Amino acid sequence: MNPTAMCNPSSSSSSSGSSSSTKAWIVHGVAVAAAVAAAYLYLTRPAKFRSRVVGIIPARFASSRFQGKPLVRILGKPMIQRTWERAKMATTLDQVVVATDDEKIAECCRGFGAAVIMTSESCQNGTERCNEALQKLEKKYDVVVNIQGDEPLIEPEVIDGIVRALQATPDAVFSTAVTSLKPEDAFDPNRVKCVVDTRGYAVYFSRGLIPYNKSGKVNPHFPYLLHLGIQSYDTKFLKIYPELPPTPLQLEEDLEQLKVLENGYKMKVIKVDHEAHGVDTPEDVEKIEQFMRERNFL
């Protein structure tokens, strides 16, 4: 018997095993190196990374759905005041200001003690208004929180949550929050839906129901997400946002978040246990007042 022939299978098997083992170690080494690099970048960030934070409440009088919405009274107080009072309770904000192009809104806000920044009428959305207000502030900030003026019951903890998420995620330039979507809001275009990936980054936002299954019906077992409309930005990104070209999805859905995603930037999303109470139409005022009365939230 040829001893060489007897050894060949064993030798081949050994060689194959060795090759597989080597490949496994290479893959493992690459993964470890990537983890070490990520940890290094995280740990070597400046000690005060994104530490200076300003909250800006953009407010405009003109609205196709609800003219003069910021000044509508909710149980005796202007809605913009209720939003400002809630924002002031957030512990991560160094300052809270209102940005508006309307003198009536500015006068109202100064009356209850809010700092006001006057902006131009040319701002296309709240993000652009926040950017213009940022340029006019005397102090320098690392993070801007865009606080929707039509969320008079916004939880301070939600504001703090998105700020901390942005501070902890160096590769994201934007952060926002979502909560569970109610079945009755599934097909309401005023309730923006969101899908996220397994790492908590935004994949898409839509006024339609997403994901949308073949039956065309709401799946009662699927955890649909509702966007809360509050967002924070790294100020370096915010300054270039107006220069980014409008994108097809942004224009089709009329959602400024899509401009960020379509231009290739990352957006961190946190899930919170918060019931959304946005005011989009005059009918919403009565609903939110009833909610506040029931909970003695005056």
Question: Predicted regions span which residues?
Answer:
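Conserved core of the sugar-phosphate nucleotidyltransferase
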Residues: 154-247
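Terminal signal-anchor or tail-anchor transmembrane helices
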Residues: 7-10, 14-46
